[in-house]
């Protein structure tokens, strides 16, 4: 058997399986690390040379149920639901 193209047909074992954090088939079984998100590291793996990859999974690509509310309340100056206090007229 040669060490080139013919040998690649002999490969059967999977080196990567599904990652529990990102859901991609990038979790290396022997290394126990994900090639996509870096799991089990606390911080998500991201590099500037992967600008497209960053764009796919950055803030704003999901539901953003809380951040949408924050933007709305920021526009209104973070007012609570109470009516504004009456200001004494100086005459």
Swiss-Prot record:
In its UniProt entry, the species of origin is given as Schizosaccharomyces pombe (strain 972 / ATCC 24843) (Fission yeast)
Q: Which residues belong to zinc fingers classed as C4-type?
A: 19-37
Q: Does the keyword NADP apply?
A: no
Q: Which InterPro entries match?
A: Ribosomal_eL37 (IPR001569), Ribosomal_eL37/eL43 (IPR011331), Ribosomal_eL37_CS (IPR018267), Ribosomal_zn-bd (IPR011332)
Role this protein plays? Component of the ribosome, a large ribonucleoprotein complex responsible for the synthesis of proteins in the cell. The small ribosomal subunit (SSU) binds messenger RNAs (mRNAs) and translates the encoded message by selecting cognate aminoacyl-transfer RNA (tRNA) molecules. The large subunit (LSU) contains the ribosomal catalytic site termed the peptidyl transferase center (PTC), which catalyzes the formation of peptide bonds, thereby polymerizing the amino acids delivered by tRNAs into a polypeptide chain.
Coarse class of the primary localization is: cytoplasm
Q: From the Swiss-Prot or TrEMBL record, give the protein name.
A: Large ribosomal subunit protein eL37B
Q: How is the cofactor bound?
A: Binds 1 zinc ion per subunit.
Query: Which protein family is it in?
Result: Belongs to the eukaryotic ribosomal protein eL37 family.
Q: Which domain of life is it from?
A: Eukaryota
- Necessary cofactors: Zn(2+)
Which keywords appear in this protein's UniProt record, sorted alphabetically? Answer: Cytoplasm, Metal-binding, Ribonucleoprotein, Ribosomal protein, RNA-binding, rRNA-binding, Zinc, Zinc-finger
Where does this one sit in the cell? Cytoplasm
* Molecular function, one GO term: rRNA binding
Q: Which residues bind Zn(2+)?
A: 19, 22, 34, 37
Q: Name one GO biological process term.
A: cytoplasmic translation
**Quaternary state and partners of this protein?**
Component of the large ribosomal subunit (LSU). Mature yeast ribosomes consist of a small (40S) and a large (60S) subunit. The 40S small subunit contains 1 molecule of ribosomal RNA (18S rRNA) and at least 33 different proteins. The large 60S subunit contains 3 rRNA molecules (25S, 5.8S and 5S rRNA) and at least 46 different proteins.
**GO CC term (a single one):** cytosolic large ribosomal subunit
Q: State which gene encodes it.
A: rpl3702
């Amino acid at each position: 058997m040669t060490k080139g193209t013919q040998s690649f047909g002999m490969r059967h074992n999977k080196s990567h399986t599904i990652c529990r954090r990102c859901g991609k088939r990038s979790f290396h079984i022997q290394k126990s690390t994900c090639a996509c998100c870096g799991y089990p590291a606390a911080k998500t793996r991201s590099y500037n040379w992967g600008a497209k990859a960053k764009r796919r999974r950055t803030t704003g690509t999901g539901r953003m149920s809380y951040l949408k509310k924050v933007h709305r309340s920021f526009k209104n100056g973070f007012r609570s639901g109470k009516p504004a206090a009456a200001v004494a007229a100086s005459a």
